[in-house]
Swiss-Prot record:
Pathway: Nucleotide-sugar biosynthesis; UDP-N-acetyl-alpha-D-glucosamine biosynthesis; N-acetyl-alpha-D-glucosamine 1-phosphate from alpha-D-glucosamine 6-phosphate (route II): step 2/2; Nucleotide-sugar biosynthesis; UDP-N-acetyl-alpha-D-glucosamine biosynthesis; UDP-N-acetyl-alpha-D-glucosamine from N-acetyl-alpha-D-glucosamine 1-phosphate: step 1/1; Bacterial outer membrane biogenesis; LPS lipid A biosynthesis. The gene is glmU. Catalyzes the last two sequential reactions in the de novo biosynthetic pathway for UDP-N-acetylglucosamine (UDP-GlcNAc). The C-terminal domain catalyzes the transfer of acetyl group from acetyl coenzyme A to glucosamine-1-phosphate (GlcN-1-P) to produce N-acetylglucosamine-1-phosphate (GlcNAc-1-P), which is converted into UDP-GlcNAc by the transfer of uridine 5-monophosphate (from uridine 5-triphosphate), a reaction catalyzed by the N-terminal domain. InterPro entries: Bifunctional_GlmU (IPR005882), GlmU-like (IPR050065), GlmU_C_LbH (IPR038009), Hexapep (IPR001451), Hexapep_transf_CS (IPR018357), MobA-like_NTP_Trfase (IPR025877), Nucleotide-diphossugar_trans (IPR029044), Trimer_LpxA-like_sf (IPR011004). It comes from Erwinia tasmaniensis (strain DSM 17950 / CFBP 7177 / CIP 109463 / NCPPB 4357 / Et1/99). This is Bifunctional protein GlmU. It comes from the Bacteria. The lineage of its organism: Bacteria, Pseudomonadati, Pseudomonadota, Gammaproteobacteria, Enterobacterales. Keywords: Acyltransferase, Cell shape, Cell wall biogenesis/degradation, Cytoplasm, Magnesium, Metal-binding, Multifunctional enzyme, Nucleotidyltransferase, Peptidoglycan synthesis, Repeat, Transferase. In the N-terminal section; belongs to the N-acetylglucosamine-1-phosphate uridyltransferase family. In the C-terminal section; belongs to the transferase hexapeptide repeat family. It catalyses: alpha-D-glucosamine 1-phosphate + acetyl-CoA = N-acetyl-alpha-D-glucosamine 1-phosphate + CoA + H(+); N-acetyl-alpha-D-glucosamine 1-phosphate + UTP + H(+) = UDP-N-acetyl-alpha-D-glucosamine + diphosphate. Gene3D superfamilies: Hexapeptide repeat proteins, Spore Coat Polysaccharide Biosynthesis Protein SpsA, Chain A. It is found in: Cytoplasm. Its cofactor is Mg(2+).
């Protein structure tokens, strides 16, 4: 096992022609984040002292999307093979460190597998990640003599007997910095593709009498690459199945694991139940006995014990105290807070608003830039009119206020505790004390009026 410091090279220069996209291939999303970010995250599990990202097509898009100052950006102006890509990064290799080579379009690689690779790398030699495939077509074959790895032959350069070999090269390897620089300087492009293959360093190492040790990944799918959208969609389902399995084994009840997407991280308590077609994004924390209904989307939110989220609700950057209920068809936008026992019903939207303990907004309301006290009833059709075309203003509603249906509150405005607002009222000024507030005109009846008739 190598105990030397380590740096990483991630190859991410490919255009991804078969994606039929203007976006660089490695920026296409898997589980809500770019494929290459998954690889960076895995590399960082090994405490790499430097992560070199070799880029080419769409470099500015990459730099903008990743926005990571700790990355060392290495330009590969021409894509002349994996060996050529590593040659561009070689000036950054320290002689006394190990270099781990990864790929930006192999997103399921894990820190666990990479530590396994570290464990087998011999001093002065190469650690190589390989897998056995029933159908190895298209992959470089591992050449062994007396059981020891001596080389890799690419598909287009292989003889018929070599094509029958089932052990293939994943492209992921670990080698010493000084050795790797020396081997890279000896690469040629004398092959069917006219490219510089990184795989040729295996034969060079063997010629020097260096030991090459191969190891398999924890899961074969970790080394699957993405060249088209079908492969990306396939790996998405592989990833989601793995996440669902982990959650089920940790006590979360997923009603249908095949219809659940985790695009981030999920912390959870005991006896959490999640129905079908739920999407979790960013970092979400669910307390004990939380129930999430079908079709909900929850992002970067904390939902405390005993909350019930009914179907088709969308919750983003929100905080829910215990015993709250939301939905169905509710939307909690960033900055929404529900105190203990609060209820937000169907077709209610909140944004930068706090609903106090035991307060209820049952249906068909918009509550934006609002501070609402405890035990408040928000009637159907209530709107906090918070925007004048330029500025956002705040509405403050005290404890025990009853807001009748079809009420508009023109912010900035405050309503004192205990006020009752009659249905159909427009609140334009502060209400300073408890009582009934209303501003509608007397009801009129025109008995002679006749409804218009359609012409026949």
């Amino acid at each position: 096992m190598s105990n030397r410091p380590m740096s990483v090279v991630i190859l991410a220069a490919g255009k991804g022609t078969r994606m039929y996209s203007d976006l660089p291939k490695v920026l296409h999303l898997l589980a809500g984040k770019p494929m290459v970010q998954h690889v960076i995250d895995a590399a960082r599990e090994l405490n790499a002292q430097r992560v070199n990202l070799v880029y080419g097509h769409g470099g500015e898009l990459l730099k903008t999307a990743l926005d990571d100052r700790s990355l060392n950006w290495v330009l590969q102006a021409e894509q002349l093979g994996t060996g050529h890509a590593m040659q561009q990064a070689a000036p950054y290799f320290a002689d006394d460190e190990d270099i781990l080579m990864l790929y930006g379009d192999v997103p399921l690689i894990t820190g666990e597998t990479l530590r396994r690779l570290q464990a087998v790398k011999p001093d002065g030699g190469i650690g190589l990640l390989t897998v056995n495939l029933a159908n190895p077509t298209g992959y470089g074959r591992i050449i062994r003599e007396n059981g020891r790895v001596v080389g890799i032959i690419e598909q287009k350069d292989a003889a018929p007997e070599q094509l029958a070999i089932g052990e293939i090269n994943t492209g992921i390897l670990l080698a010493g910095g000084a050795d790797l620089k020396r081997w890279l300087s000896k690469l040629t492009n004398n092959n069917a593709q006219g490219e510089y293959y990184i795989t040729d360093i295996i034969a060079l190492a063997h010629q020097e009498g260096r030991q090459i040790e191969a190891v398999h990944p924890v899961r074969t799918t970790e080394t699957d690459g993405v060249n088209n959208r079908l492969q990306l969609a396939t790996l998405e389902r592989v990833y989601q199945a793995e996440q669902a399995e982990k959650l089920l084994l940790s006590g979360v009840m997923l009603q249908d694991p095949a219809r659940f997407d985790l695009r981030g991280t999920l912390e959870h308590g005991r006896d959490v139940v999640i129905d079908t077609n739920v999407i979790i994004e960013g970092h979400v924390k669910l307390g004990n006995r939380v129930k999430i209904g079908s079709g909900c989307v929850i992002k970067n939110s904390v939902i405390a014990d005993d909350c019930i989220i009914s179907p088709y609700s969308v919750i983003e950057d929100a905080q829910l105290a215990p015993d709250c209920s939301v939905g169905p068809f509710a939307r909690l936008r960033p900055g929404s807070e529900l105190a203990e026992g609060a209820h937000v019903g169907n077709f209610v939207e909140m944004k930068k608003a706090r609903l106090g303990k035991g307060s209820k907004a049952g249906h068909l309301s918009y509550l934006g830039d609002a501070e609402i006290g405890a035990n408040v009833n928000i009637g159907a059709g209530t709107i906090t009119c918070n925007y004048d075309g330029v500025n956002k203003s705040k509405t403050i509603i005290g404890d025990d206020v009853f807001v009748g249906s079809d009420t508009q509150l023109i912010a900035p405005v405050s309503v004192a505790a205990g006020v009752t607002i009659a249905a159909g009222t427009t609140i334009m000024r502060n209400v300073p004390a408890a009582g009934l507030v209303y501003n509608r005109k007397e009801q009129q009846l025109n008995a002679s009026w006749q409804r218009p008739q359609k012409k026949k």
